[in-house]
Amino acid sequence: MLTKDEIGKILVEACSTGADFAELYFEDTTVSNVRIIQDKVDESSATNLYGCGLRVLKDMEEAYGYTNDTSFDGLWQLAQNLKQNYHSKPLISAVSFQEQQRTDHTTFGSLAVDYDQLCATLKQIAKTILAYDSRMIQAAATYQGQLQKITVCNTNGVFANDTRFIQRIAAQAVSKDENSMQSGFDSYGGNFDFKALMDYDYDEFAKKIAQTAITMLTAKEMKGGVYDVVIHNAFGGVIFHEACGHSLEATSVAKKLSFFSDKLGEKIASDVVTAIDDGTIANEWGSQNIDDEGNPQQKRVLIENGILKSYMIDMRNARRMKMPSTGSGRRQSYRFSPTSRMSNTYIANGSSTFEEIIQNTKYGLFAKSMGGGSVNPATGEYNFSVSEGYLIEDGKITEPVRGATLIGNGKDTLLKIDMVADNLSLGYGMCGSLSGSIPACVGQPTIRVKAMTVGGKGE
C-alpha cells in the first residue's frame, strides 16, 4: 500500500489539467465457492481480485480507468492517461486527508472459514432434502463467500478503509412424479463471520425447501384473472426492489428517466406504505461500514406513509441533482465506476397481522414464494413468477397452485397496497446494474395488493 503522501501526489496529478475531483479505490478480494450435488463435491474454487480504480471528474464529465499495478509508478501512469481528457488550468494543488468519524455496522470475530465443517453442512442439507420424500430426485447446496478489503481516497480529504465478508448458503431441491418436475429454493447469508453463518438451523432450512418442491407437484395450474394478491414476506420484496427501488436511484432520477423524478414530497404510495433502504443493519447481507465512495453508510427513508421522502444518491449524481450524497455509491469491484445503488431495501412493518390479512381476503392468491421476473425500468412495468402459490377462499389458504405470474406497474402497485403485516423479513440476492453485481437484500412484511393482474394457464 502506498503512503498517504504518494496517494495525494497521484490525486493531484490526475487533476492537473482542470479536473475538480479525483478518487482512488484500492481493492483486495478473495471469492470462494463450494457446490455439493447429492453427496458429492461438484465444485470448489477460490479466486483473487486485486487492483485499483482511478476516477476523475470535471463537473459531470467522468474519466475512469483501472489497473492491477498498484505501485506508485503504475498509478502515476494511470493518472497521466486519464488527465488527457481535460485541457484547462489545475484547480487542486494539494490534498489533506481527514480522520473520518463513523460507526461500524459490520464486525467479525474471525475471517477464517472451516471448510471441513462447511462441506459437512452442505452435504447434510442435500441429504435432508433427498430423504424428505421418495419423489425427490436431486439436491444441491452451495456456499458463496467473498472477503473484500477496500481503501477509498479522494481529493475531498477522504481516506477510509472497510472490510466486508459476505457469505451465503443456498440450496435447491428438484422433485418429479409422472406428471411434472418441480423445484424449491432458499438461501441464508450476511456480512458476518463463519461462526455466524453456522449458527443457523439448516435442518429446518432444508425441509422447507423440500416441502415446496413436493407440494408443487400436486398443485393445479393457476387461472389467469384479476385477484387480490397476498405477497409473503422476505423475498416477496423483490417486486418493490425491481419495479420501484431502481427508479428511486439517482442513476435514473438525476437524468429524469424515472417516473419518480421531481416527486419529493408527493404521494406516490398508499398511506400504509413506508419503504426504507438501510445500509446500517448490523452484519446484514447488503450492509457496509462505508459505501464505495468512502462515505459512512446511512439509513434512508425513501417513502413515509405514502409520501416520497428521499432518493438514493451517489456523489456524481449529487452534482446533477444539487443534493447531498446519501452514502449510496456502490460498485462490484475496482473495475467499475460507482453509482447509486440499493443496500438492504424493504417495506417497513405495518399494523396488521399475517392472519388478519388472510382472514380479510374473500378470494385471492397467496404468493408464498417468488421466482424470477423482468422489469421495464423506464415504465416500471413488471412480471414476476410465483414459485409457490395457494388460493385464498373465504379467508382461508386452501389448495396449492402453480404457473402464476404477477403482472403490473410499480407506481400503480404502490397505490394498491391496502394491508401491511408486522412480520418483516429479508431475502438475499445479487443485484445487477451499471456498476456491476453487488449483494443486496430485498424484504417486506406480508402485504396485500388489491385487484392485481395474475397470469396463468389454468381453466
What residue spans do the PLM features occupy?
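N-terminal small-residue-enriched
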Residues: 1-459
